[in-house]
Structure formats: structure tokens, C-alpha cells
């Protein structure tokens, strides 16, 4: 048995300002820091064997807040996914074997919103109309100008999940993934076998842990959402 914990980052400054964020590397708001601290308290007793996060600061800061308060994790090492076969090549000492490894990958980044990035969502509705903005935000296959659709985001996020995260879960490890609303919705769609319509309507709150218990066949045995 293994545990998979998925958590969206705490509120960012641009979340607070109701702006499309995407790959813009904005920090957590004060409320977002408090949300991350609250999630950290909820997960303080949970043992994690390894963690995964995106290249974006808001996800990483949420992850570090969780690990800082975790009573089972005392030290960790970051490993960047550079695409090179050598990126993880190092000899671990006995002490380093106790370190929690954090894998950082662009494939877990938020959906890329293209020309909408930085634009206030209410302003976008004024410019393009409610229906068009709703389609860009909630349809599965339609991408905003020069951006990604949810389907495109799902392709990269699920591929990374299958190649990097599933093998760890099948070894019985407890995994923490701290990422973004759309990359995590894609993973949730995959593991819960949701339809495109179901995941398009699925709301994922900031800093609200989703904890799945699964077996080696990746069957979901239980799900718990902490709020």
C-alpha cells in the first residue's frame, strides 16, 4: 500500500488579484502563506518518502512549508529534471539515504495561458466576452491564444505522472505532489478515471490536500480531502 498526496499551492498574489497566472513565476500572497502553513499542520504527522513539484515558486514554497513542519522529514535534496541522463548521478552516503528527494519538473507546471497571462479575468471578459473566456478556462480542448488547452496540459502532466510517480507508488512509497490547479486536475482525471467534462467542472481549492491510498496495481482504495 502507498499514499499519494496531491496539493495545489496556496493562494498566489495573482490569484488574489484575479489574474491569469500560468507560467508567470509569482509568489504566494500572505493568505497563501497561511494556507500553506495550515496544510502543513494537517500533514505534519504524514510520512513522505519523496516529493515532486513544478519549476514555479508558488508550488515550491508551499511544498517547503509542508516539509518544514513535517515531523518525519528532517532534510531533503532537490533534483532538477533537466532531461539529461546525468541529472541524478551522485553517490549517496548512508546519511544522505535518509534525505527526502524533491524532484522538480516543468511538466508539472500550471497550464500555459499564453496571451491571457497577467490579464485580470474580469478585464478579459470585457475584452472577449463571458462565453469566450469561459470556453478558454473550462473547455478541455480549446486553448487560449498562444496558450495550452487543458488537454495539452494533461498530456505532459500525465506522462510525467506515469513515468516518474507511478513507479514510486508501486514500490510502496508515500509520495507528495505539490503543483497547480490544472496539472493536478489532469492527474486526478487520470487516476479517478473521470471524463473530460467531469474534470473541466472539477474545482481544486488552494492548499487542500487530496490523499489517495492505492495498491501496486494503482487501484484507488480510498480518498480523503482535507479542508
UniProtKB/Swiss-Prot annotation:
Pfam families: His_Phos_1
Active site: 9 (tele-phosphohistidine intermediate), 110 (proton donor/acceptor)
GO MF annotation list: phosphoglycerate mutase activity
Catalytic activity: (2R)-2-phosphoglycerate = (2R)-3-phosphoglycerate
Example GO BP: gluconeogenesis
Pathway annotation from the record: Carbohydrate degradation; glycolysis; pyruvate from D-glyceraldehyde 3-phosphate: step 3/5
PROSITE patterns: PG_MUTASE (PS00175)
Residues the entry annotates as binding substrate: 8-15, 21-22, 58, 110-113, 121, 137-138, 181-182
InterPro entries: His_Pase_superF_clade-1, His_PPase_superfam, PG/BPGM_mutase_AS, Phosphogly_mut1
Keyword annotations of the record: Gluconeogenesis, Glycolysis, Isomerase
Gene3D superfamilies, alphabetized: Phosphoglycerate mutase-like
SMART domains assigned to the protein according to its UniProt record, in alphabetical order: PGAM
Class in the EC hierarchy, top level: isomerase
Annotated site residue numbers, Transition state stabilizer: 180
EC number: 5.4.2.11
Subunit structure: Homodimer.
Free-text function comment from the UniProt entry: Catalyzes the interconversion of 2-phosphoglycerate and 3-phosphoglycerate.
Family from the record: Belongs to the phosphoglycerate mutase family. BPG-dependent PGAM subfamily.
Name of the protein this chain belongs to: 2,3-bisphosphoglycerate-dependent phosphoglycerate mutase
Native source organism of the sequence: Pseudoalteromonas atlantica (strain T6c / ATCC BAA-1087)
Lineage, top ranks: Bacteria, Pseudomonadati, Pseudomonadota, Gammaproteobacteria, Alteromonadales
UniProt gene name: gpmA
